[in-house]
């Protein structure tokens, strides 16, 4: 024991190994380094065996069974703190905007094809939901749509004649009637399709214009309407004048014809009279 105390007294400036290990660990983990307490070279108090044994117990890994944070060595505690900080830094999540954004556009700004696609998707989704509800036994309502409004705008005359009804007549007449009916139905379908396409195009063109352009178009239409009405009035007046002139001319011509006929008859009578008188005069000297 005395030899051991003499060794410690002989090297008072040498720090204990536990302090060296703790300084290394604190330097690696980024914790502030604490300067060790200066030892008095004059030999104030040498290290006692109790302190040395305590430091040796802390240096031994797994002292006290290795259970609990208080029973661990300073190196183990420092490593645990470093691992916890690294785990927190690794788990830190920064929210970033999604790369795939859905740009919503109002229905009025969509083109006709995009409107058709959206309506088709909505109808398919509604049909799928209705099928799921029907499979679960829940009451299902009809799909809500505004197509009936468009149908009411162009009402068609009902077909009072049933398709299976037979008409009296020959087979040729029935075939001709069927072909005429099919051609009429095809023509009506084409006319309706053209009207719908024209209405869609006109609606899209109006929706794409500003308020000033719409006002300017409205004033232009009013000006053209007034010009058309004035032209129609002038044509009606001209037609009335042309219809009145031929009648008047016909009456004048008829009167002229009647006057000429009367004059011709008078001249004919005078000619006959002069011929008779000339014949009489020619017969007297010869007798």
From Swiss-Prot:
InterPro entries in UniProt: HEXIM
Which segments show compositional bias classed as Basic residues? 89-105
- Please give the residue positions where the record annotates the modification Phosphothreonine: 34, 48
Query: What organism does this protein naturally occur in?
Result: Bos taurus (Bovine)
What binding partners and quaternary form does the record give? Answer: Homooligomer and heterooligomer with HEXIM1; probably dimeric. Core component of the 7SK RNP complex, at least composed of 7SK RNA, LARP7, MEPCE, HEXIM1 (or HEXIM2) and P-TEFb (composed of CDK9 and CCNT1/cyclin-T1). Interacts with CCNT2.
Name the Gene3D superfamilies for this protein.
6.10.250.2910
Functional note: Transcriptional regulator which functions as a general RNA polymerase II transcription inhibitor. Core component of the 7SK RNP complex: in cooperation with 7SK snRNA sequesters P-TEFb in a large inactive 7SK snRNP complex preventing RNA polymerase II phosphorylation and subsequent transcriptional elongation.
GO MF annotations in UniProt:
7SK snRNA binding; cyclin-dependent protein serine/threonine kinase inhibitor activity
Q: What is its main location?
A: nucleus
Q: Where is this region: Interaction with P-TEFb?
A: 142-145
Q: Does the keyword Transcription apply?
A: yes
One GO biological process this protein is involved in is: negative regulation of transcription by RNA polymerase II
Q: Where is this region: Disordered?
A: 1-212, 266-287
Q: Which residues form a coiled coil?
A: 208-278
One GO CC annotation, please?
cytoplasm
- Entry-annotated residues carrying Phosphoserine: 31, 53, 55, 73, 78, 83
Q: Which top-level group of life is the source organism from?
A: Eukaryota
Bias type Basic and acidic residues, positions = 115-134, 181-212, 266-280
Alphabetical UniProt keywords: Coiled coil, Nucleus, Phosphoprotein, Repressor, Transcription, Transcription regulation
In its UniProt entry, what is this protein called?
Answer: Protein HEXIM2
Q: Which family does it belong to?
A: Belongs to the HEXIM family.
Q: What is known of its domains?
A: The coiled-coil domain mediates oligomerization.
């Amino acid at each position: 024991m005395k030899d051991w105390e003499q060794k410690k007294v002989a090297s008072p400036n040498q720090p204990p190994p536990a302090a060296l290990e703790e300084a290394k660990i604190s330097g690696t983990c980024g914790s502030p380094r604490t300067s060790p307490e200066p030892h008095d070279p004059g030999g104030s108090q040498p290290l006692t065996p109790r302190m040395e044994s305590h430091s040796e117990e802390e240096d031994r890994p797994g002292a006290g069974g290795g259970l609990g944070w208080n029973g661990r060595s300073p190196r183990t505690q420092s490593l645990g703190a470093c691992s916890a900080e690294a785990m927190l830094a690794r788990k830190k999540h920064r929210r970033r905007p999604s790369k795939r954004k859905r740009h919503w556009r109002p229905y009025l700004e969509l083109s006709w094809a995009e409107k058709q696609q959206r309506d088709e998707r909505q109808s398919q989704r509604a049909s799928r939901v209705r099928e799921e509800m029907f499979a679960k036994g829940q009451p299902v309502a009809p799909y809500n749509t505004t197509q009936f409004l468009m149908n009411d705008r162009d009402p068609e005359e009902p077909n009072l004649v049933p398709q299976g009804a037979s008409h009296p007549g020959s087979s040729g007449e029935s075939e001709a009637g069927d072909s005429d009916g099919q051609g009429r139905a095809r023509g009506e379908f084409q006319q309706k399709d053209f009207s719908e396409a024209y209405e869609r195009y006109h609606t899209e063109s109006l929706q794409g214009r500003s308020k000033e352009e719409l006002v300017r178009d409205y004033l232009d239409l009013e000006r053209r309407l007034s010009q058309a009405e004035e032209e129609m009035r002038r044509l009606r007046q001209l037609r009335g004048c042309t219809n009145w002139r031929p009648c008047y001319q016909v009456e004048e011509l008829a009167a002229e014809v009647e006057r000429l006929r009367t004059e011709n008859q008078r001249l004919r009578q005078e000619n006959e009279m002069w011929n008779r008188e000339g014949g009489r005069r020619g017969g007297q000297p010869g007798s």
